[in-house]
A protein has these predicted regions:
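Membrane-embedded alpha-helical bundles that constitute the cytochrome b-like, heme-associated redox core
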Residues: 1-240
């Protein structure tokens, strides 16, 4: 049986917005920046570090919190645009190709912020995280172990889903699409991590942000389900 060509609107024909090299450089820059600020600067330039961060620096904690919130918003942005693409609402705004590019961009930059969010905590003296506690889920027993692990697992799933775009041709469109369903788990885990482990979750603006973004994702998800259920099925081929 000859191979069937995919429809022209299938995402398997879309190329990544960034090359693999550019994506790798972005992630390496996030890792290097966090490690330089948390480890190298205090060791090699303690005077400069103290002048920037103070004698008892809480700047690392503030940087981790702000990077975490930014990473969450980028994840939400990516998930929302992914749902807009699958619902075909993106045709109205901002257009299919632009929506795909924004979806990829937000995902990749979100990973970079997630890396910075975790690794910058190496400089925090209050929690005194080790590298292994930051990279291994349930590795920390001092601060909300389960709640922190939700974010760690969500990050790894997010990285797998995002970077799968670069191996889409190897794993096949069907496997790539199935892997993308993990985005719902990613968003749920990261949202739970932010609400349960984040010290800013008690602030009213942050609560409004979580409720608003969560409601939008929920609406787009139900809209996708309803449109898929009501979509006419292709007629079965007649057999001789």
């Amino acid at each position: 049986m000859p191979p069937v060509n995919p429809p022209p609107n299938r995402l398997d024909a879309v190329k990544p917005m960034f090359s693999a090299r550019a994506a790798l450089l972005m992630l390496v820059a996030a890792i290097g920046g966090a490690l330089a600020a948390a480890i190298v600067l205090p060791l090699w330039a303690p005077t400069l570090s103290e002048s920037l961060l103070g004698p008892e620096p809480k700047a690392y904690w503030y940087l981790a919190r702000s990077a975490g919130l930014a990473g969450y918003l980028l994840l939400w942005f990516s998930v929302a645009f992914g749902l807009l693409i699958s619902n075909r609402l993106a045709r109205a705004w901002p257009g299919g190709p632009a929506a795909v590019d924004l979806h990829q961009f937000a995902s990749l930059v979100g990973i970079a912020y997630g890396l910075f969010h975790a690794l910058i905590l190496l400089g925090d003296r209050y929690l005194s995280y080790t590298l292994w506690q930051l990279v291994i889920p349930f590795g920390s027993a001092d601060y909300r172990r389960v709640e922190v692990a939700l974010g760690q697992i969500g990050f790894y799933l997010m990285a797998a889903v995002t970077l799968s775009f670069y191996v889409r041709q190897r794993i096949g469109y069907r496997a790539w699409r199935l892997l993308h369903y993990a985005s719902f788990a990613v968003y749920s885990l990261v949202l739970a991590h932010g609400i349960l482990a984040g010290t800013d979750a008690s602030a009213l603006p942050v609560q409004v942000m979580y409720i608003g973004t969560g409601a939008i994702v929920l609406f787009l998800t139900f809209y996708r389900i309803l449109t898929a259920m009501n979509r006419p099925r292709p007629a079965a081929r007649e057999t001789a």
